[in-house]
């Protein structure tokens, strides 16, 4: 039986962080076992915010592919490509933009959110307003059956379906496929300062860090504000650190951390050292593979 088709991409705007690893890449690795997967470097999408310095996009694209390969994205199982190498993305974007009402774009619930997150950049451009149309083109171009997304991205996919539906109504039924969602669990991790983990905020733990840099970041992470001193009891669920333990620390050890935090038997520094050890254990094999691809980039 022919496998269902999936399309997904990541903007090449900088280094990938642990949120990408947990929320996207680990899902991609599993999905490629069951679906026909098309994974792409969204370099045209990256231009919506990085148009003043495209060198960032070029470097990020290369680094991104090395990370993808190192975490387990297999070119023998998945199609990996750069968006700008397939000109049909731009052609279909142009055609879809002709039939997409402006009001559909203006009501996009993440438009204001992204403008706030990237407020240091000038995003008063047609490209930024119209990026959901390019996103729709990316998906329907490949007749994708499904798209892996988090719950917060459902409005984007619904807009893609609306655009495809309108196109088919005008030009003929069945031309464009309306994709369905595969809901993936969003990574519940925060940055070192307690805000959403983001390259833009400068608070991210990146997938490819030196051990020393990672140590410095982990040791500077905010913890439960109630724990001003080691002898003060805390609550793991109120700590920025604990969600990372849920992903990288075995349950038996997590139980000890919860007990130790609530009884003040375990200090925050010790808790951070445990997390650091587990992060290094998880990512050290990935770092070695990235180093290999860096050394053999010409092959």
Segments and roles (model prediction):
Residues 100-106, 141-148, 249-257, 285-287:
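Short helix-capping/linker segments at secondary-structure and domain boundaries
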Residues 68, 96, 152, 194, ...:
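Divalent metal-coordination and catalytic microenvironments
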């Amino acid at each position: 039986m022919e496998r269902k088709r999936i399309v997904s991409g990541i903007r090449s705007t900088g280094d990938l962080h642990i949120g990408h690893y947990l929320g996207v890449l680990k899902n991609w690795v599993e999905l490629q076992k069951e679906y026909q997967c098309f994974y792409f470097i969204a370099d045209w999408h990256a231009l919506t915010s990085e148009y003043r310095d495209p060198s960032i996009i070029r470097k990020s694209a290369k680094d991104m592919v090395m990370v993808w390969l190192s975490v387990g994205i297999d070119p023998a199982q998945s199609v990996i490509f750069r968006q700008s190498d397939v000109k049909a993305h731009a052609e279909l974007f142009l055609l879809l933009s002709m039939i997409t009402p402006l009001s559909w774009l203006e009501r996009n619930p993440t438009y204001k959110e992204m403008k706030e997150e990237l407020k240091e950049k000038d995003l008063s451009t047609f490209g930024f307003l119209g990026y959901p149309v390019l996103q729709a083109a990316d998906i329907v171009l490949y007749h994708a059956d499904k798209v892996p997304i988090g719950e917060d991205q459902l409005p984007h996919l619904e807009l893609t379906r609306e655009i495809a539906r309108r196109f088919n109504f005008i030009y003929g039924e069945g031309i464009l496929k309306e994709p369905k969602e595969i809901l993936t669990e969003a990574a519940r991790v925060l940055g070192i300062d307690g805000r959403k983990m983001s390259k833009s905020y400068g608070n991210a733990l990146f997938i490819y860090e030196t051990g020393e840099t990672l140590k410095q970041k982990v040791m500077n992470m905010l913890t439960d504000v109630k724990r001003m001193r080691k002898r003060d009891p805390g609550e793991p669920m109120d700590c920025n650190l604990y969600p990372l333990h849920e992903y990288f620390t075995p349950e038996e050890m997590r139980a000890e951390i919860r007990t130790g935090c609530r009884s003040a038997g375990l200090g925050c520094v010790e808790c951070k050292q445990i997390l650091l050890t587990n992060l290094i254990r998880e990512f050290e094999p990935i770092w070695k593979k990235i180093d290999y691809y860096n050394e053999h980039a010409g092959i």
